[in-house]
Amino acid sequence: MGTCKYKRVMLKLSGEALAGENGFGIDFNIAMNIAKAVKELVDMGIEVGAVVGGGNIWRGRSGEGMDRTTADYMGMLATSINALALQDSLESLGVDTRVQTAIEMKEIAEPYIRRRAMRHLEKGRVVIFGAGTGNPYFSTDTAAALRAAEIEADVILLAKKVDGVYDKDPHKYDDAKKYDELSYIEVLEQGLQVMDSTATSLCMDNNIPILVFALDNPENIKRVVLGENIGTIVSKK
């Protein structure tokens, strides 16, 4: 086994990653495979925080007649459903896990308290952050960047459907070029599809590297933590 490159990581998963080929809902086989990969990190002594999107359950569209704020709050509830599903998969493997939500849901999760989250991580517990930032108009990418800064994570592991960052959509263009490394400024200036601009700026301001990789094989989570060059790293350069 290689040497761990990071001590504390923030894993950002899209809600669609949990849906698998169904495109909607939760594929519990996929949730379990992700949980197994996270367990490997915990067994290696790595402290893991996680943020899951909600797009497999709800994709709010203010343009379809719904109030944007209401749609965003519904999305926060969707992320909390995903957080509980991932917690269940992890705990079935014996991984001590806590869900903390930015909106109080005391019957099912702890409220987000930074000091408590840090203490859980130090004790080897996985902490899953639900309900985004608790505020409308902010994405779960921004929530991941914010929580990563607050818990002093060494890196954000950004699991996507593609194996890195490209200059254009590799599913549409055969000549799409993959980047091995990028600076935050390059991502922002070129409008590259990594995180949204708010999240990218937050990572830049706090010098948090973003490691983009494909989740088609959950083993990739361990591989990137061990330093394998299988994705794109976004940093100050």
From Swiss-Prot:
The lineage of its organism: Bacteria, Bacillati, Bacillota, Clostridia, Eubacteriales. PANTHER family: URIDYLATE KINASE, URIDYLATE KINASE PUMPKIN, CHLOROPLASTIC. ATP binds at residues 12-15, 55, 59, 166, 169. One of its GO terms (biological process) is 'de novo' CTP biosynthetic process. One of its GO terms (cellular component) is cytoplasm. This is Uridylate kinase. One of its GO terms (molecular function) is ATP binding. Pathway: Pyrimidine metabolism; CTP biosynthesis via de novo pathway; UDP from UMP (UMPK route): step 1/1. Belongs to the UMP kinase family. It catalyses: UMP + ATP = UDP + ADP. The gene is pyrH. Keywords: Allosteric enzyme, ATP-binding, Cytoplasm, Kinase, Nucleotide-binding, Pyrimidine biosynthesis, Transferase. Homohexamer. It is found in: Cytoplasm.
